[in-house]
Amino acid sequence: MGILLDGKPVAKMIYAEIKEWLGNLQEKPPKLVLFCSEPDDSTKTYMNSIVKRGGKLGISVEICHAGENPVEEIKKLNESRDVAGVMIMHPLKNVDEKLVVSALSLEKDVEGRTPGNLGGIMTGDESFAPPTAEAVMEILRFYDVSLSGKDVTIVGRSTTVGKPLSMLMLKKGIDATVTICHSRTKNLVEKIKRANVLVSAVGRAGFITKEMVGKDSIIIDVGINLYDGKIVGDVDFEQVEPEVAAITPVPGGVGIVTTAILFRHFMVSSRRMVGRR
């Protein structure tokens, strides 16, 4: 039976940092803005969860609906001394999302989506990494999982998980050997089975089965899928969990740590802003 890499104590640790910072503030913290355009039901649910979490922490979260000139609206948020973080809710309907994201300042890009922040991960500059990628690293650190010299296979090549996570794992001092797989990868099962650490970010329920994993492997399940009315990951948890050394659950794993990382990024951005006031 594998060790459960539970995300709850990791998130709790991060929220404790944030609460300590808030408790020491001499003034009201800046706002977090959720910038959206005709959000669908799943996006609304996600936005509501961020608003709720902000309320629990004592952080004001404001929803801003895109108008006729979203790029100019983002630039105004960049200049606002009352806003420390902006989340651009994907997808932005009837809007050039790349243009809007590129207009956001690096300092307020708490999701690590701007070209500047993504580039900073590659060059080793201080920047905000996409929270899901950072959440994976935070879980591994919390449970003392060393990646040095380990073979890591990441299934998924998105700019929110696969690509930035590979850069974080390749950093000097982390020193993983990383393979990124995708829909065109040949011999996928072979590459997954030989991995010391597997990260699945495919978005397909039950994609990873027990036949695909090694006995001593560590499984990080980034997937969030709705299956038979339940939230499940990419990994067939019931089958795979007894076969591996350690595994993250879904829900209760990477997802809840991702939200905590978002608010940590907001805290960092707020500290910079308050220092300039």
UniProtKB/Swiss-Prot annotation:
Cysteines engaged in disulfide bonds, as pairs: none
Q: What is its EC number?
A: 1.5.1.5, 3.5.4.9
Q: Please, one GO biological process term?
A: L-histidine biosynthetic process
Recorded GO CC terms = cytosol
Q: Name one Pfam family in it.
A: THF_DHG_CYH_C
- What keywords were assigned to this record? Amino-acid biosynthesis, Histidine biosynthesis, Hydrolase, Methionine biosynthesis, Multifunctional enzyme, NADP, One-carbon metabolism, Oxidoreductase, Purine biosynthesis
Free-text function comment from the UniProt entry: Catalyzes the oxidation of 5,10-methylenetetrahydrofolate to 5,10-methenyltetrahydrofolate and then the hydrolysis of 5,10-methenyltetrahydrofolate to 10-formyltetrahydrofolate.
- HAMAP family per record: THF_DHG_CYH
Q: How does it assemble?
A: Homodimer.
Protein family according to the UniProt entry: Belongs to the tetrahydrofolate dehydrogenase/cyclohydrolase family.
Q: What is this protein called?
A: Bifunctional protein FolD
Origin organism of this chain?
Kosmotoga olearia (strain ATCC BAA-1733 / DSM 21960 / TBF 19.5.1)
